């Protein structure tokens, strides 16, 4: 979120939606807790506003209301302000029963839904393995995001999958191992 606050906040929101979708639920509401440094610093205030506008834009697109939230400013240490930290919770409704994953077997297929791009900016991989902070941040294509979530919900509803996991922190390798 600190490299591109708008896309970072949207990415947090989308990940929360994907987590709900992976249970077979349709996202219907969102709550947020936005944590930032001193808003009297113009750069920090700009970061906050960009994050807020990104969340608003994605919520309007998905028609998901923000039903509650909290903003926490002045989060700083002697070394300076914290990185912008949007925390997003999404609520969903399940039509019948929750999707309960079952163990996979040899011979089962692994299906990847969505596109991958060369967007590792701001990742822990870059920061901790390569000691690099920067790069191109992941961005969310709103239409593709919605189409992908609807596809996953359809697969779950039609009992065509044994388990579903979103790809987020740790990337593909962590998603597969979990």
Indicate residue ranges for each PLM-predicted region.
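Glycine/proline-enriched, intrinsically flexible loops and inter-domain linkers
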Residues: 1-178
